[in-house]
Structure formats: C-alpha cells, structure tokens
Amino acid sequence: TRRASDIPGVHNIIVADAPQGQLSLKVQGRSDYKSLQCIVRQHGKMKTLNVQDFNTSVKYLVGKYDIEVLSLPRLNFSVDIKQSHTNTVEIPQPGLANVLLASKGHGDIFLEKDNKLELIHTLNHLSTRETLVMQPGKYRLIFKPQSSRESIYTQERSFKISSGTSTQVRL
C-alpha cells in the first residue's frame, strides 16, 4: 500500500523526531592555524562521522561523540550533545616551533608527559629547517645526522612551547 504522502514525481516530506544540539569549536586568542580541523565520531566507534573546521558550529543528533583535534599533538575530547544546547570545545592558542638543524638527518619530536615520551611528529629527513604549529607543552627533539652510522651521535634538545610565542630549536 502507498501512503498519501508518497506521490511519484512530487517532493515528499517525511517527518521524523530527530533531537539535535550544536558543537562549536574555538581556538583561544589569535591562531597560527591556517585550517585546523577535528574528526567527529560517534562515541566508541572509529568510523568518521564528520570533519569539522574550527571556528564553526555544526548541528548533530543528541548523543555522545568522540572528537580528535588534528593538532600537534593530537587532542581528544568526549562530548555529550544535548537537545537545543551548544557544546563548546575550546583549545589553547598554539605556539610555533622553528626547528633548525645543522645537517639533514632523522629526527622525531616527542611530547614529554608524566615522565614518558610520546611520539607526535617525524621531521622531514631531506630538510634542515621546519616550522611547526604546536599546542603549549614540553617537548623533546631527538635527532641523528644522516652521515652518522652510530647512535653515539644522536642529539637531544628539550624545549617548551607557550601560547602565542615562537621558540627556536637548534641542533
């Protein structure tokens, strides 16, 4: 049987109860991010629901969502969207790390957290300088020149990134 509202060739409107709320993403202060985005997923699932730009608000169905901010380092949040409410996720203003190396080589940047190191970025081994937009925190650069074959030539440099500032990291 056909419902009265299902007429071929005519725009049909089907009413469904779909309570919604909004997710607003913001960066504190002036941002050096050109196009910061986050991945929005339903809570506990890995399938991407949306990729949302910062400084925007988007409507979502009521429920729990996991958010992964594509910053250095990655930031993860869990939000509970409620009907007719706006949830705001605000992250700190980033800083800049200007990495200057004496030679080409292999280097990684780690986040220093709870006396542990977490890999957050691998440097371009074909370049001697790189500028990175990073979240405030304590970091460590570990670098081995390309010409060195032994680990004894590995160098380390700890550095701190603060909101709105530029930090030079030389090795």
Region locations from a protein language model:
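Short loop/turn and low-complexity linker motifs enriched in small/turn-promoting residues
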Residues: 1-171
